């Protein structure tokens, strides 16, 4: 058996490619190309040894688990086709060997194997690789030695963790081969990433109508929530699959502004917006589209010098100035609130787990200038770490407790005395036209209790629909023994349970939630929500999911079309009618006398 000959002629590779493909590059051998030749020769030797022992006709190995992961070896089976079922049903695989077969085509479903770290396609008859190969961002080794590849897809640029791309033995264009020879795999992948045109722009997201608005006089309100990915967090090391030009803040902020202008929501809640971007860019730019805003940075900014503090991200609420007047605004500092609660004094979990987090919530109290309806608008960014479900729950409990206290206070707020819009020089739109303020101001509405005031609560809650955070907000209560709290001690929260007085619902629950709101290679799921009070508002329209066909070749965001790793949520509501009497006497101030003259 040791003297057995390989089952293909020595002068030709198994796929019929002459050995001259290996030796015909008339250049000095470099370190990188020497590695290509060595690894290619190793691959051929392994196949030859298996041929000599008759292993090429053995049954294909089923999925096996080793200390390094799960793998399937279909090498040397003379396979001409691989069914897509393998890729779809075995998405858990970390290694896949399809080398030394007779494959001429690789199905696009290969993109389903997003856990792969090692893929060997050597010694086949492949003439091309599908663009979906770029979805395999966990790949460390991609071996395509000794095929018939005449080019490589630009989507390989997404494979930022790739350590070895084995291309020797293919009629690859000289410019690509030159980069590999002189600079190696890492630089070739970078070349693809930085020069790729990227995917075609996706279709516009569908607008989903849940209920028709039949009365043109019906009061409506639209809200948009968006984690815009702070510039400080948007690094090449974190988002290595994205071209550097698409990560640049100057590029991303223009895309973000473009979406905000396109949606034209009455209320906009942004998370991960830093102080500098709020003051120097968004506040000024959005003022041209009738927006005013409030902002607070995360609590660590208080201890920093001004130059560092302006780079700290936080939460901002923008609102249409011609439609709403700001009655009050409040900051909810979770850590500071927690350590100052009498029932939590001495609780070690507060000091060890909650206090070190600087996450915040921002709450605004608005009034519709024309109808007198009032709104509580909350915007929050909850702690991110999946291992701290208890901290997330405590933060949201403090948020809801704070909103409840503010709501009680605001239910007793006096009527707004002057709701005529004041116009500023930067309040005109880009064409120099003034905002439309034709509606006459109406009397302020009264609310008997805080829970009667319409609530819109936006944010990145970093919590899935199966979480305790979701349960608390939608059900209004959770038990002190909830699994997300574990065995931690958080004062009354873990003694008596947690509750709030509002009747809240996720806007997107009407369609079973979004497919995802956060889209990165290692996670695609729902973390962001717009909640609304069902006793005062009815959701009638939603901005739908991103096109699935587009996503088939996009391993993660951000990219040239989506400037954040989160997507914007956008919803429309009608304000339900109320029987409460309106305040009969309203003082609109000096402006009323001016109108009479």
Swiss-Prot record:
Protein name in UniProt: CCR4-Not complex 3'-5'-exoribonuclease subunit Ccr4
| Compositionally biased region (Polar residues) | 12-28, 51-69
Give me the stretches of Basic and acidic residues compositional bias: 29-45
Keywords recorded for this protein, A-Z? Cytoplasm, Exonuclease, Hydrolase, Leucine-rich repeat, Magnesium, Metal-binding, Nuclease, Nucleus, Repeat, RNA-binding, Transcription, Transcription regulation
Pfam families per the record?
Exo_endo_phos (PF03372)
Q: Which InterPro entries match?
A: CCR4/nocturin_mRNA_transcr, Endo/exonu/phosph_ase_sf, Endo/exonuclease/phosphatase, Leu-rich_rpt, Leu-rich_rpt_typical-subtyp, LRR_dom_sf
The primary location reported for this protein is cytoplasm
Chain sites annotated for binding Mg(2+): 272
Where in or outside the cell it occurs: the entry states: Cytoplasm; Nucleus
Question: In which family does this protein belong, per the annotation?
Answer: Belongs to the CCR4/nocturin family.
Q: Which organism is it from?
A: Phaeosphaeria nodorum (strain SN15 / ATCC MYA-4574 / FGSC 10173)
* Biological role stated in the UniProt entry: Acts as a catalytic component of the CCR4-NOT core complex, which in the nucleus seems to be a general transcription factor, and in the cytoplasm the major mRNA deadenylase involved in mRNA turnover. Ccr4 has 3'-5' RNase activity with a strong preference for polyadenylated substrates and also low exonuclease activity towards single-stranded DNA.
The enzyme's main class, written as a single word, is: hydrolase
Q: Where are the LRR repeats?
A: 66-89, 92-113, 115-136, 138-159, 161-183
Q: Which GO terms describe its molecular function?
A: 3'-5'-RNA exonuclease activity; metal ion binding; poly(A)-specific ribonuclease activity; RNA binding
A Gene Ontology cellular component where this protein is annotated is: nucleus
SMART domains linked: LRR_TYP (SM00369)
Q: Which reaction does it catalyse?
A: Exonucleolytic cleavage of poly(A) to 5'-AMP
BP GO annotations: nuclear-transcribed mRNA poly(A) tail shortening
- Gene that produces this protein: CCR4
Q: Which top-rank group of organisms is this from?
A: Eukaryota
User: What's the Enzyme Commission number for this chain?
Assistant: 3.1.13.4
User: What residue spans carry the region label Disordered?
Assistant: 1-69
For activity, the cofactor(s) needed are: Mg(2+)
Annotated signal sequence range? none
């Amino acid at each position: 058996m040791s003297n057995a000959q390989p089952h293909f002629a020595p002068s030709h590779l198994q796929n019929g490619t002459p050995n001259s493909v290996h030796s015909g590059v008339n250049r000095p051998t470099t370190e990188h190309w020497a590695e290509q030749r060595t690894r290619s020769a190793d691959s051929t030797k392994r196949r030859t040894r298996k041929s000599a022992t008759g292993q090429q006709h053995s049954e294909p190995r089923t999925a096996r688990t080793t200390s390094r992961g799960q793998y399937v070896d279909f090498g040397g089976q003379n396979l001409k086709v691989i069914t897509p079922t393998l890729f779809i049903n075995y998405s858990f695989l970390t290694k896949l060997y399809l080398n030394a077969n007779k494959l001429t085509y690789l199905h696009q479903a290969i993109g389903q194997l997003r856990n792969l770290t090692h893929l060997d396609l050597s010694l086949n008859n492949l003439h091309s690789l599908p663009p979906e190969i770029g979805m395999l961002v966990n790949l460390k080794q991609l071996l395509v030695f000794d095929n018939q590849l005449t080019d490589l897809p630009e989507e390989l640029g997404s494979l930022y963790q790739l350590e070895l791309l084995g291309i020797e033995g293919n009629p690859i264009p000289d410019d690509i081969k030159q980069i590999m020879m002189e600079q190696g795999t890492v630089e070739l992948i970078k070349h693809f990433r930085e020069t790729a045109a990227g995917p075609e722009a996706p279709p516009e997201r569908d607008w989903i109508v849940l209920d028709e608005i039949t009365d043109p006089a019906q009061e409506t309100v639209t809200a948009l929530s968006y984690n815009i990915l702070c510039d400080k967090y948007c690094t090449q090391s974190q988002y290595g699959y994205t071209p550097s030009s698409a990560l640049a803040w100057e590029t991303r902020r223009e895309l973000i502004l473009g979406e905000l202008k396109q949606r034209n929501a009455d209320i906009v809640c942004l998370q991960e917006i830093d102080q500098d971007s709020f003051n120097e860019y968004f506040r000024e730019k959005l003022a041209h589209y009738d927006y005013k805003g409030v902002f607070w940075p995360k609590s660590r900014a208080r201890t920093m010098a001004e130059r560092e503090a302006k780079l700290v991200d936080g939460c901002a609420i923008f609102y249409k100035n011609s439609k709403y007047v700001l009655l009050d605004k409040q900051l909810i500092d979770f850590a500071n609130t927690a350590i100052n609660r009498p029932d939590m004094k001495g609780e070690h979990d507060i000091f060890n787990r909650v206090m070190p987090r600087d996450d915040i919530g921002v709450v605004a109290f608005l009034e519709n200038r024309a109808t007198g309806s009032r709104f509580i608008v909350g915007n929050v960014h909850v702690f991110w770490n999946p291992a701290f479900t208890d901290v997330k729950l405590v933060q949201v409990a403090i948020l809801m407790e704070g909103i409840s206290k503010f709501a009680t206070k605001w239910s007793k707020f006096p009527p707004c005395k002057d709701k005529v819009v004041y116009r500023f020089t930067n309040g005109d739109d880009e064409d120099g036209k003034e905002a439309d303020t034709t509606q006459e101001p109406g009397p302020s509405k009264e609310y008997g209790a805080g829970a009667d005031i319409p609530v819109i609560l936006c944010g990145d809650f970093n919590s899935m629909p199966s979480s305790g955070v979701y349960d608390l907000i939608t059900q209004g209560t959770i038990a002190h023994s909830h699994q997300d709290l574990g065995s931690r001690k958080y004062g009354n929260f873990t003694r008596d349970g947690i509750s709030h007085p509002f009747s809240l619902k996720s806007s997107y629950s009407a369609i079973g939630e979004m497919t995802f709101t956060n889209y990165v290679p290692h996670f695609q799921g729902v973390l962001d929500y717009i909640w609304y009070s069902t006793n005062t508002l009815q959701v009638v329209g939603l901005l739908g999911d991103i096109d699935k066909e587009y996503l088939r070749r996009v391993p993660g965001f951000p990219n040239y079309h989506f400037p954040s790793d989160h997507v914007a949520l956008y919803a429309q509501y009608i304000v339900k009618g109320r029987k409460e009497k309106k305040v009969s006497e309203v003082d609109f101030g000096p402006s009323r006398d001016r109108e009479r003259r």
